[in-house]
Amino acid sequence: MNISKHNLIQIQDLQKEIEENDDLEKIKLEEYETENIEILKITISKSIINNTTIINSNFEKCMFIDIQFNNCNFSNTIFENCSFIRCEFNNCKLTGCNFNENTLLDTNFINVNMNYTNITISDLKNVYFKETGLKNANLQNNKVKNIKFQEADLTQIQIFQTSLNGIDLSKCKIDGIAISIDDIKWATINQVQALDLIYLLGVKII
């Protein structure tokens, strides 16, 4: 993702800016830390957010368009009915986050800690998880199209009513994955991974 660093407006206090504006465009936010905040119906676009910590917070009906998040921490934050369009998360921490009724479109997660994250009742299209941890995460009741996992850690992930049809998992860790036959059907796996999924057939290997 290439967001021009020129003509970005440096802001110091995100909450103050949000109180004064419904839409924030071409901003740069760095070294910002806060927690337990609630942000409602805000749109942020064409911006870069670096080294920012916003934890244990709640974003509702917010839109993030053309945003680059670098080295950010949003642990245990709820994103309710939000949209992420052409966004990129690099080296971020999203542990324990809840993405409920979200739209994720053309969005990349690169080297991100998403362990214990919940993504539910959401639409995911053209989403890329590269070298990203999704241990003990929960994907439930989602509509997905053209999502890609590259060397992602899906250990003990729970996937229900979220079809992985056509998705290549062969380079991912899937130890202890909980998934139904219908959801894993037509996904690509390797021979070792097949042993982790043999339980779905109700048989034992001796």
Residue locations for each model-derived region?
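Tandem repeat scaffolds
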Residues: 2-206
